[in-house]
């Protein structure tokens, strides 16, 4: 049987890999999985092809007897929160998150707002490939798609209920918001305004082509945003990806702070806010060693897991963990919801700053200093990924390092770590290394790239 779902949903280039025919068939499988008369919320980000795909999905769902509600354009976490709080049986989000502009995708959400478990993905794939759809009789096709207008307001109010609004308001923070010309522009400024912030925006208009910057917030794509933070002398900058489930922060000195750094600080803050919670967080093997180094001071256990928000979210929920996060800026705060949420992360960071009464630069300087270097190699036909992993283990495994092989190969040394893994969303192999010496990090990445390329 074939495979549709990757690390985070079904993705592909619109009209090439993610064709109308495939999406119609997939939506019929999704609707059959949820069952006749189930209530399903459909929404999307700003991407090209989004409106086309929404209409196809809604048509496919209607054809198998599902009651369909259209939530319009909204951040993925807003749609997930609406599914959970407004009584839906599930949701379908049209998004490719951080992928380049030509991509779009389908994310399936369960009634708890979390992306469906891997076993349920397999069930939908089985229905898709065997074409066992619960197609209804023509005489039952009398319902229309209904409009759901409460998505954004419900979401923003939910976020605000988890932070001390008055404490943040007293600080009169100046913030810069970079929503990547996508749906983060529809919600994060509303959160900032409610928290009494003076708001600046960059890349704030909706643009399906992501003309100003790539939808993935990286060190390179945020160079201009970081310069604006310094020029305007704001207290905090926040940048989202295409569907605003991530938040990458830029501190008051204009330094881009990667997601495992912000996730570490927010995990500490979650433990302060929820003193009775289990002192455990869940993060992917792609996160830095600084996570354990810092959180161990507060007796917070770190549970490493595979890369992918689906796996992390369900592990956080199953283990009743304090929080979960990825190094890419996706942070999960369980009192709100068990999914990545960019605007919730932003509100929590402002609350942490207000509580600590320090600048954002001073706050991030509390963390151990590591230098991060990343690259990627195209996954060419015939490239044997498992053989690459085996070679890396042969070269780098010694008694003085720790090897983790639950998702690619991660090696942790005294003052460095690296990860090599096949991407679950793109045909590439990702290489990342961190070290307390920048030259060590650069050398590691160069060495690993040669091994991956077979040189």
UniProtKB/Swiss-Prot annotation:
Keywords, sorted A to Z: Isomerase, Magnesium, Metal-binding, Phosphoprotein
SUPFAM superfamilies according to UniProt: Phosphoglucomutase, C-terminal domain (SSF55957), Phosphoglucomutase, first 3 domains (SSF53738)
Disulfide bonds: none
Residue spans crossing the bilayer: none
Active site: 97
Post-translational modification: Activated by phosphorylation.
CDD domains xrefs: PGM_like1
Molecular-function GO term, any one: magnesium ion binding
Top EC group: isomerase
Sequence positions bearing Phosphoserine: 97
Gene3D superfamilies xrefs: Alpha-D-Glucose-1,6-Bisphosphate, subunit A, domain 3, Alpha-D-phosphohexomutase, C-terminal domain
Record note on cofactor: Binds 1 Mg(2+) ion per subunit.
Binding-site residues, Mg(2+): 97, 241, 243, 245
GO terms of biological process kind: carbohydrate metabolic process
Cofactor dependency: Mg(2+)
Presence of the UniProt keyword Ligase in the record: no
EC identifiers of the protein: 5.4.2.10, 5.4.2.13
Name listed for the protein in its UniProt record: Phosphoglucosamine/phosphogalactosamine mutase
Organism: Sulfurisphaera tokodaii (strain DSM 16993 / JCM 10545 / NBRC 100140 / 7) (Sulfolobus tokodaii)
């Amino acid at each position: 049987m074939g495979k549709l779902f990757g690390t985070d949903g079904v993705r592909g280039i619109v009209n090439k890999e993610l064709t109308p025919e495939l999406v119609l068939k997939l939506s019929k499988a999704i609707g059959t999985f949820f069952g006749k008369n189930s209530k399903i919320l459909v929404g999307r980000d700003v991407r090209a092809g989004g409106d086309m795909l929404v209409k196809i999905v809604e048509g496919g769902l209607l054809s198998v007897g599902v009651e369909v509600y259209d939530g319009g354009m909204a951040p993925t976490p807003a749609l997930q929160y609406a599914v959970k709080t407004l009584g839906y049986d599930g949701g379908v989000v049209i998004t490719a998150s951080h992928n380049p502009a030509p991509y779009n995708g389908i994310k399936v959400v369960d009634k708890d707002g979390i992306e469906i478990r891997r076993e349920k993905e397999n069930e939908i794939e089985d229905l898709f490939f065997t074409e066992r759809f619960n197609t209804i009789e023509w005489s039952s096709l009398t319902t229309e798609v209904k409009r759901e207008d409460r998505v954004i307001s419900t979401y923003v109010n939910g976020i605000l209920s988890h932070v001390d609004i008055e404490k943040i308001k007293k600080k009169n923070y100046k913030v810069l918001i970079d929503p990547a010309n996508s749906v983060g522009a529809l919600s994060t400024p509303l959160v900032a305004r409610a928290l009494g912030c003076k708001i600046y925006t960059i890349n704030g208009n909706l643009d399906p082509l992501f003309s100003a910057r790539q939808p993935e917030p990286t060190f390179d794509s945020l160079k201009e945003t970081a310069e604006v933070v310094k020029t305007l002398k704001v207290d905090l900058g926040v940048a989202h990806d295409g569907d605003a489930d991530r938040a990458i922060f830029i501190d008051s000195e204009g330094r881009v702070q990667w997601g495992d750094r912000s996730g570490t600080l927010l995990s500490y803050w979650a433990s302060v806010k929820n003193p009775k919670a289990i002192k455990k967080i869940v993060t992917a093997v792609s996160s830095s060693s600084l996570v354990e180094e810092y959180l161990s001071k507060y007796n917070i256990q770190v549970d490493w897991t595979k890369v992918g928000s689906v796996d992390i979210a369900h592990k956080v929920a199953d283990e009743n963990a304090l929080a979960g996060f990825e190094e890419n800026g996706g942070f999960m705060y369980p009192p709100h919801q068990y999914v990545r949420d960019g605007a919730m992360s932003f509100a929590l960071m402002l609350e942490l700053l207000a509580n600590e009464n320090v600048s954002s630069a001073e706050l991030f300087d509390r963390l151990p200093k590591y230098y991060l270097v990343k690259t990627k190699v195209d996954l060419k036909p015939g490239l044997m990924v498992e053989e690459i992993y085996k070679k890396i283990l042969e070269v780098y495994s010694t008694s003085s390092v720790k090897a983790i092989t639950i998702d690619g190969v991660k090696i942790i040394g005294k003052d460095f770590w690296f990860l090599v893994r096949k991407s679950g969303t793109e045909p590439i192999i990702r290489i990342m290394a961190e070290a307390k010496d920048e030259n060590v990090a650069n050398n590691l990445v160069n060495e690993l790239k040669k091994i991956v390329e077979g040189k």
